[in-house]
Amino acid sequence: MDNLIIGGTEVKSRLFIGTGKYSSNSIIPRILKKSKSQVITIALRRVDITSKEENMLNYINKDCILLPNTSGARNAEEAIRLARIARAAGCGNWIKIEVISDNKYLLPDNYETIKATEVLAKEGFIVLPYMNPDLMDTKRLVNAGAAAVMPLGAPIGTNRGIATKEMIRIIIDEIATPIVVDAGIGKPSQAAEAMEMGADAVLVNTAIASAGNPVLMAEAFGLAVESGRKAFLAKLGQEKLMAEASSPLTGFLR
């Protein structure tokens, strides 16, 4: 069985979906249905979790796993506070840690992220930290209690693909904890590439939300992730420098 287990929970779809940038929350149910996604992120700073009117949570199937994120947190203390607010509001124990103090490139602060992860993991949260891909920091996050790690492929919202692929390859090779490639994936082919590399899942938001037909694009990403995973399990053929004929070059009829 090819199961993805995070924090003791089986995750059936390896495509995680973000909820930012959609023109209307009403499109979210169709996005989830077509993508077959089970894990969906919500930014606490963008959602009034106490409101009953036009609440994003009303559009999310109860079977989905909510992954609130701490977007807007500039340090560990702010991330910890947001995580506690999310759990108190009924959003569950899953939390995506985002600590960003860089306002230009929006790159995560690994040091503060590690601190927040350690505190929240001890409090019983299922912590998925968003991070700059660095092997030693990944090991520190795992030791701090991360249930999965989320290295960035490229800066948030850029659709530039997996610019950090060599660093992510190293992490995949060295870390047994689930790896979810997050940020920068702009095409279904790039999501498939991440899965072919051996990533356990990918998180996509901008590429779907900014598409001409977001619902169709969500379906395309779902298929790409499934295909990429199957390719990884099938074991890709080895690349070679020299040509190698697929048919014999001797013994032709004369």
UniProtKB/Swiss-Prot annotation:
One of its GO terms (cellular component) is cytoplasm. 1-deoxy-D-xylulose 5-phosphate binds at G157, A183, G184, N205, T206. InterPro entries: Aldolase_TIM (IPR013785), Thiazole_synthase_ThiG (IPR033983), ThiG (IPR008867). The keyword Cytoplasm applies. It catalyses: [ThiS sulfur-carrier protein]-C-terminal-Gly-aminoethanethioate + 2-iminoacetate + 1-deoxy-D-xylulose 5-phosphate = [ThiS sulfur-carrier protein]-C-terminal Gly-Gly + 2-[(2R,5Z)-2-carboxy-4-methylthiazol-5(2H)-ylidene]ethyl phosphate + 2 H2O + H(+). The lineage of its organism: Bacteria, Bacillati, Bacillota, Clostridia, Eubacteriales. The active site is at K96. This is Thiazole synthase. It is an enzyme of class 2 (transferase). The gene is thiG. One of its GO terms (biological process) is thiamine diphosphate biosynthetic process. It is found in: Cytoplasm. The keyword Transferase applies. It comes from Clostridium kluyveri (strain ATCC 8527 / DSM 555 / NBRC 12016 / NCIMB 10680 / K1). Signal peptide: none annotated.
